[in-house]
UniProtKB/Swiss-Prot annotation:
<dbReference type="GO" id="GO:0007487">
    <property type="term" value="P:analia development"/>
</dbReference>
<dbReference type="GO" id="GO:0005634">
    <property type="term" value="C:nucleus"/>
</dbReference>
<feature type="region of interest" description="Disordered">
    <location>
        <begin position="309"/>
        <end position="419"/>
    </location>
</feature>
<dbReference type="GO" id="GO:0007474">
    <property type="term" value="P:imaginal disc-derived wing vein specification"/>
</dbReference>
<keyword id="KW-0238">DNA-binding</keyword>
<protein>
    <recommendedName>
        <fullName>Segmentation polarity homeobox protein engrailed</fullName>
    </recommendedName>
</protein>
<keyword id="KW-0804">Transcription</keyword>
<keyword id="KW-0371">Homeobox</keyword>
<dbReference type="GO" id="GO:0035290">
    <property type="term" value="P:trunk segmentation"/>
</dbReference>
<keyword id="KW-0217">Developmental protein</keyword>
<dbReference type="Pfam" id="PF00046">
    <property type="entry name" value="Homeodomain"/>
</dbReference>
<keyword id="KW-0597">Phosphoprotein</keyword>
<dbReference type="InterPro" id="IPR000747">
    <property type="entry name" value="HD_engrailed"/>
</dbReference>
<feature type="compositionally biased region" description="Low complexity">
    <location>
        <begin position="317"/>
        <end position="382"/>
    </location>
</feature>
<dbReference type="GO" id="GO:0007367">
    <property type="term" value="P:segment polarity determination"/>
</dbReference>
<feature type="compositionally biased region" description="Low complexity">
    <location>
        <begin position="93"/>
        <end position="108"/>
    </location>
</feature>
<keyword id="KW-0805">Transcription regulation</keyword>
Length: 552
C-alpha cells in the first residue's frame, strides 16, 4: 500500500513537467543574459558619448563655463560607469551556473545608469520636447500605466532603437548618476527651445536656470508712475462721487420740493460768493475742507422740517463791504451738528466780502472764527462785544422752535457787523443735534378734579417717631433698604413714608445752606441751567458774569 501511494500517478512527477520546467528555466536564464548584455552595451555607448561630450564641453553650467565642480562630477560618473561595466562582465561570466540565476529577483540587478542625450535614445519626447532622460524611459518600460499622456502628438515620437525593440523583459527603475551628482536635475535643454505646451503640468526641473528672467530694478521713475496712477484713480473716484452727489441734489425739482430747492440754491450762492472773495490759497483750502457739507446738511435739515410751517424768508440785502454778519450759530466740534446749523445759516445769512472770512470758517470753533474775523474786517475793534446775560436769552429756550432760534440769534449781532460769541445753549446737543424734533411748546396742565376726599391726608408723625427719624438722619442721611425695613417695623410706618421724610429733610437742608453742585453752577453760568430755585449769591453772580464775559 505504501508502495502504491509512493508510485501513484497523482503524486509522481511526470517527465513532461520536468522538461517544461527545465525549458522555462533556460528561457529565463537566456532572457536575463540578454538583458544584462543590453545593459552593458548601453553603458559602453553612454561612456563613449560622455567622453565625447566632455571633450566638446557640452555639459556647461547655466551661469558660467564648464567649471571644476562639473568636471569632477563627470569624472566620478565615468569612473562609476567603468566600475559598473566591470561588475556586469564578471556577473555575466558567472551567470552560467544555475545557482547564480535561481530566482528572477536576484538575477535582475538595480542598475545605476548614466544620462543619455537625444542622439542615442530619442524615442520619447518629455513634455512635448525632443530630449528625454533614461530613467523615465526605464520607468515607462517597467510600468504599463506610467505613460506620458502629454506625448500625444505624432511628430513628437520616434521609433525606438533596435536594442530596445528586442527587449521583452522589463528592467527595474534606474537612477541617473549625472542627475545625482550634478547640481541640476534633468536633461540638458536645447538652447532657444521654449515650452510649447503651456497647459500641461509644470515640471520645474525642465526650465533651465539661464532662462529665468532676472527681476528689473524698481527705479524712481516706476515709483513716480505708480503714485501718479494711484492719484489718477483717486481723482476719478472722487469725481464720480461728486457727480453722483450732484445728481442726487439736482433730483429735487422746485415744484415738488420748493423748500429743499431753496435751501440748495441759497447754499450754492453763499459758497460761490465766499469762493469769489477769498484769495486763492484760502479758497483752495476751503474747497478741500468744506466741499459739500453745507449743502448736504441743509438738505437733511430741510427734509426733517417739511411738515412744519415755513419761516418767512428774509430777502438778501445788496452786497456791501461795510456791514453784514453771519447770523447762523456755529456748529459744535462733532460733524453730526453740521446738518442742523448750516441750514440755519442758509435762510438768514447774507454773503458779502465782509463776512467771507467768517463764512470760510463755518466749520470751526467760535474762538477760531473770532480770530479770523478780527484779523479781517474787525481789525478796528479787536475785543468782541460781550454776550448779553442769560436773562436776555429766553429763560424757556427749550420751548422754542428752530425758526424762533433763527430770529433770536440774528438779533444778537450788532448793526456794525461785529461777530459775537454765541450763548452756550447754542452748543447744547439737545437743540443743535436733533433738528427733526420740531417746535417745543409748553403744554398747559389740565386742572385735576380731585376732591378733598380723594387726596391722601398728610402724614402726622408723633413726637417719638420724629425724634427717632431725626436721630437716624443725623447718623446717616441715606438709608439702606434693610435699615428702612427695620425702621418701618419699629415705628409702625410705611417704607414710602420714611423714604419721603428723608428726601424732604435732605432738600430742606440743601435749600437752607444754598450749596450747589459745581456742574449746576457751570451750567447756570452758561445759561443752560435756569432753575433758579435758590437766589444767587454774590460769588455766583460774579462767576456767572465772568463766564458770560461781562467782567474782564
Amino acid at each position: 500500500m505504501a508502495l502504491e501511494d509512493r508510485c501513484s500517478p497523482q503524486s509522481a512527477p511526470s517527465p513532461i513537467t520536468l522538461q517544461m520546467q527545465h525549458l522555462h528555466h533556460q528561457q529565463q536564464q537566456q532572457q536575463q543574459q540578454q538583458q544584462q548584455m543590453q545593459h552593458l552595451h548601453q553603458l559602453q555607448q553612454l561612456q563613449q558619448l560622455h567622453q565625447q561630450q566632455l571633450a566638446a564641453g557640452v555639459f556647461h553650467h547655466p551661469a558660467m563655463a564648464f567649471d571644476a565642480a562639473a568636471a569632477a562630477a563627470a569624472a566620478a560618473a565615468a569612473a562609476a560607469a567603468h566600475a559598473h561595466a566591470a561588475a556586469l562582465q564578471q556577473r555575466l561570466s558567472g551567470s552560467g551556473s544555475p545557482a547564480s540565476c535561481s530566482t528572477p529577483a536576484s538575477s535582475t540587478p538595480l542598475t545605476i545608469k548614466e544620462e543619455e542625450s537625444d542622439s542615442v535614445i530619442g524615442d520619447m519626447s518629455f513634455h512635448n520636447q525632443t530630449h528625454t532622460t533614461n530613467e523615465e524611459e526605464e520607468a515607462e518600460e517597467d510600468d504599463d500605466i506610467d505613460v506620458d499622456v502629454d506625448d500625444t502628438s505624432a511628430g513628437g515620437r520616434l521609433p525606438p532603437p533596435a536594442h530596445q525593440q528586442q527587449s521583452t523583459a522589463k528592467p527595474s527603475l534606474a537612477f541617473s548618476i549625472s542627475n545625482i551628482l550634478s547640481d541640476r536635475f534633468g536633461d540638458v535643454q536645447k538652447p532657444g527651445k521654449s515650452m510649447e505646451n503651456q497647459a500641461s503640468i509644470f515640471r520645474p526641473f525642465e526650465a533651465s536656470r539661464s532662462q529665468t528672467a532676472t527681476p528689473s530694478a524698481f527705479t524712481r521713475v516706476d515709483l513716480l508712475e505708480f503714485s501718479r496712477q494711484q492719484q489718477a484713480a483717486a481723482a476719478a473716484a472722487t469725481a464720480a462721487m461728486m457727480l453722483e452727489r450732484a445728481n442726487f441734489l439736482n433730483c429735487f425739482n422746485p415744484a415738488a420740493y420748493p423748500r429743499i430747492h431753496e435751501e440748495i440754491v441759497q447754499s450754492r450762492l453763499r459758497r460761490s460768493a465766499a469762493n469769489a472773495v477769498i484769495p486763492p490759497p484760502m479758497s483752495s483750502k476751503m474747497s478741500d475742507a468744506n466741499p459739500e457739507k453745507s449743502a448736504l446738511g441743509s438738505l437733511c435739515k430741510a427734509v426733517s422740517q417739511i411738515g412744519q410751517p415755513a419761516a418767512p424768508t428774509m430777502t438778501q440785502p445788496p452786497l456791501s463791504s461795510s456791514a453784514s454778519s453771519l447770523a447762523s450759530p456755529p456748529p459744535a466740534s462733532n460733524a453730526s451738528t453740521i446738518s442742523s446749523t448750516s441750514s440755519v445759516a442758509t435762510s438768514s445769512s447774507s454773503s458779502s466780502s465782509g463776512c467771507s472770512s467768517a463764512a470760510s470758517s463755518l466749520n470751526s470753533s467760535p474762538s477760531s472764527r473770532l480770530g479770523a474775523s478780527g484779523s479781517g474786517v474787525n481789525a478796528s475793534s479787536p475785543q468782541p462785544q460781550p454776550i448779553p446775560p442769560p436773562s436776555a436769552v429766553s429763560r424757556d429756550s427749550g420751548m422754542e422752535s428752530s425758526d424762533d432760534t433763527r430770529s433770536e440769534t440774528g438779533s444778537t449781532t450788532t448793526e456794525g457787523g461785529k461777530n459775537e460769541m454765541w450763548p452756550a445753549w447754542v452748543y447744547c446737543t439737545r437743540y443743535s443735534d436733533r433738528p427733526s424734533s420740531g417746535p417745543r411748546y409748553r403744554r398747559p396742565k389740565q386742572p385735576k378734579d380731585k376732591t378733598n376726599d380723594e387726596k391722601r391726608p398728610r402724614t402726622a408723625f408723633s413726637s417719638e417717631q420724629l425724634a427717632r427719624l431725626k436721630r437716624e438722619f443725623n447718623e446717616n442721611r441715606y438709608l439702606t433698604e434693610r435699615r428702612r425695613q427695620q425702621l418701618s417695623s419699629e415705628l409702625g410706618l410705611n417704607e414710602a413714608q420714611i423714604k419721603i421724610w428723608f428726601q424732604n429733610k435732605r432738600a430742606k437742608i440743601k435749600k437752607s445752606t444754598g450749596s450747589k453742585n459745581p456742574l449746576a453752577l457751570q451750567l447756570m453760568a452758561q445759561g443752560l441751567y435756569n432753575h433758579t430755585t435758590v437766589p444767587l449769591t454774590k460769588e455766583e453772580e460774579e462767576l456767572e458774569m465772568r463766564m458770560n464775559g461781562q467782567i474782564p
